[in-house]
């Protein structure tokens, strides 16, 4: 029983069906979002500040102002599209990861093309990030727009979507998808790579909450490397509002603008709260996925018996 509980379903050679990973990934996404929603709202508010890094508003000030002016419910602004985003993203991410992982293992068996375990996880994770971004991006953009709204009155997801389509066209729902694709695919690939690296390092040690610990370290590592890309993604999603311009600019132009006006550290606004949010999210996501998958497989085996 214990060996089943501690099985690494993300390792190279693990056999997981698309149905199993789809269901476990959906559960994982829903739980992870419910736990970390307020931190996500605070992170987005910090990332959208345009002042120089030294004159940035602190996390404490952002939280105090938000609670004072908008009420505690504002910590969950954008939660509806975000919950949909996380469920869809979790399902797409883990299903794609297991599918690519199986394909790479099959390729190794048939052609002799054999990637090291770390590269196997990195490639599978990066592919999972690309597919997940394509599937869920409009919800990511809506989540950002709603969380960034500083008015006390809450905006609806459908109303915000209609406003974007009306003023920016249907493609407005995909504003910033290029930096998002780069940011998310890189982050996801590094997260799975880090997770497997830590699990291999720990080996068979019986450590409580082992999957969560590995996920926490993986989340912190991947976010630390790719955070500037995430900041550019958020700025691109909010460009029309932040810069009062209907014209879109490329990621490199926006990068240069941030560095010129806010300094290099401007790319790291909200980094602390982001790590505080991303690390627990990765921990919960990977922990819940592993145990949900183990439970689903046990139920399936009992049904077959």
Swiss-Prot record:
One of its GO terms (molecular function) is thiamine pyrophosphate transmembrane transporter activity. Solcar repeats lie at residues 16-103, 116-201, 206-295. Keywords: Membrane, Mitochondrion, Mitochondrion inner membrane, Repeat, Transmembrane, Transmembrane helix, Transport. Its main location: mitochondrion. GO terms for biological process: mitochondrial thiamine pyrophosphate transmembrane transport. It is a multi-pass membrane protein. The keyword Membrane applies. GO terms for cellular component: mitochondrial inner membrane. InterPro entries: Mit_carrier (IPR002067), Mitochondrial_sb/sol_carrier (IPR018108), Mt_carrier_dom_sf (IPR023395). It is found in: Mitochondrion inner membrane. The chain crosses the membrane at residues 16-32, 84-100, 122-142, 169-193, 213-229, 270-287. Belongs to the mitochondrial carrier (TC 2.A.29) family. Mitochondrial transporter that mediates uptake of thiamine pyrophosphate (ThPP) into mitochondria. This is Mitochondrial thiamine pyrophosphate carrier 1. It comes from Scheffersomyces stipitis (strain ATCC 58785 / CBS 6054 / NBRC 10063 / NRRL Y-11545) (Yeast).
């Amino acid at each position: 029983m214990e060996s089943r509980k501690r099985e690494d379903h993300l390792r190279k050679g693990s056999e997981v069906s698309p149905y199993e990973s789809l269901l476990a990934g959906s559960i994982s996404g829903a739980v992870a979002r419910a736990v970390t929603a307020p931190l996500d709202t605070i992170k987005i508010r910090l990332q959208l500040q345009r002042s120089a890094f030294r004159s940035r508003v602190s996390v404490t000030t952002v939280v105090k102002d938000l609670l004072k002016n908008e009420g505690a419910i504002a910590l969950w602004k954008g939660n509806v599209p975000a919950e949909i985003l996380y469920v869809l993203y979790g399902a797409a991410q883990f299903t794609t990861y297991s599918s690519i992982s199986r394909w790479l293992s099959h390729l190794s068996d048939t052609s002799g093309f054999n990637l090291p375990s770390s590269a196997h996880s990195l490639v599978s994770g990066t592919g999972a990030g690309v597919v997940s971004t394509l599937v869920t991006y409009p919800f990511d953009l809506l989540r950002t727009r709603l969380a960034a709204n500083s008015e006390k009155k809450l905006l609806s997801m459908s109303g915000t979507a209609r406003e974007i389509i009306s003023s920016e066209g249907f493609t407005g729902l995909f504003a910033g998808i290029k930096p998002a694709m780069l940011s998310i695919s890189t982050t996801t690939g590094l997260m799975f790579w880090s997770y497997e690296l830590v699990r291999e390092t720990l080996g068979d040690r019986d450590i409580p909450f082992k999957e969560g610990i590995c996920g926490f370290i993986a989340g912190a590592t991947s976010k630390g490397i790719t955070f500037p890309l995430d900041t550019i993604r958020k700025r691109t999603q909010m460009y029309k509002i932040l810069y009062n311009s209907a014209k879109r600019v490329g990621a490199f132009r926006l990068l240069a603008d941030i560095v010129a006006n806010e300094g290099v550290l401007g790319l790291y606004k909200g980094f602390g709260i982001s790590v505080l949010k991303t690390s627990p999210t990765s921990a919960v996501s990977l922990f819940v996925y592993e145990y949900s998958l183990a439970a689903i497989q046990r139920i399936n085996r009992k049904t077959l018996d």
